[in-house]
């Protein structure tokens, strides 16, 4: 799927365009390293993250399940600069249909490892859980620092963006949503 020689050629052209010598010591292997790095950090493009939710377990549990602080990194599709943060995922299983906790982390990372927008990432995670697990409801909160804001433009290091996606009972029931959000945001 990845055209590594094409990526190498593009990186070499960028180095030349900024006035660097891509053949000098220290840079001569950079195009190949960047190509391999892109293959790794964009690995989510070659998978369907929803498939991680394919295996479920029957468990008599119809209360909140929350996995907090799922570390993530992604690449802002506007600047191809990383955003780094964490996702918090909460759902209420329906009919005891639960998934493995690690599957939620795999889902998050599958969607994060591609050119992405934080808003879309948050929505994709919530929608995949609703589709594959059919829970009573889902809340997803993503907090991240965007290096495109930290390193360039406004240059505001440490600023965090928080996005949320709320589905099912959490959208309809204010008390349930408030409980989920308080548990998610509690340190």
UniProtKB/Swiss-Prot annotation:
GO biological process, alphabetically ordered: one-carbon metabolic process; tetrahydrobiopterin biosynthetic process; tetrahydrofolate biosynthetic process
- Entry EC no(s): 3.5.4.16
Name the keywords, alphabetized.
Answer: GTP-binding, Hydrolase, Metal-binding, Nucleotide-binding, One-carbon metabolism, Zinc
What pathway does this protein act in? Cofactor biosynthesis; 7,8-dihydroneopterin triphosphate biosynthesis; 7,8-dihydroneopterin triphosphate from GTP: step 1/1
Q: Which Gene3D superfamilies match?
A: 1.10.286.10, 3.30.1130.10
One Pfam family from the UniProt entry? GTP_cyclohydroI
Listed GO CC annotations:
cytoplasm
Where, in this chain's numbering, is Zn(2+) bound?
76, 79, 148
Protein origin, superkingdom: Bacteria
What does it catalyze? GTP + H2O = 7,8-dihydroneopterin 3'-triphosphate + formate + H(+)
Q: Which GO terms describe its molecular function?
A: GTP binding; GTP cyclohydrolase I activity; zinc ion binding
Q: Which PROSITE patterns match?
A: GTP_CYCLOHYDROL_1_1, GTP_CYCLOHYDROL_1_2
> What subunit structure does UniProt give?
Homomer.
- Entry's family note: Belongs to the GTP cyclohydrolase I family.
> What is the protein's given name?
GTP cyclohydrolase 1
Write down the species.
Desulforamulus reducens (strain ATCC BAA-1160 / DSM 100696 / MI-1) (Desulfotomaculum reducens)
């Amino acid at each position: 799927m990845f055209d590594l020689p094409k990526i190498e050629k593009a990186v070499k052209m960028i180095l030349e365009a900024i006035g660097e010598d891509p053949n000098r010591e220290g840079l001569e292997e950079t195009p190949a390293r960047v190509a391999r790095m892109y293959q790794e950090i964009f690995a989510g493009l070659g998978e369907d993250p929803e498939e991680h939710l394919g295996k479920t377990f029957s468990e008599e549990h119809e209360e909140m399940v929350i996995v907090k602080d799922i570390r993530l990194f992604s690449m802002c599709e506007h600047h191809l600069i990383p955003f780094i943060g964490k996702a918090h995922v909460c759902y209420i299983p329906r009919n005891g249909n639960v998934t493995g906790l690690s599957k939620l982390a795999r889902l998050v990372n599958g969607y994060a490892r591609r050119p992405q927008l934080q808003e879309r990432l948050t929505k994709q995670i919530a929608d995949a859980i609703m589709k594959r697990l059919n829970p009573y409801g889902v809340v997803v909160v993503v907090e991240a620092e965007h290096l495109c804001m930290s390193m360039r433009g406004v240059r505001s290091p440490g600023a965090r963006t928080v996005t949320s996606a709320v589905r099912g009972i959490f959208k309809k029931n204010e008390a349930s949503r408030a409980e989920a959000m308080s548990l998610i945001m509690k340190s």
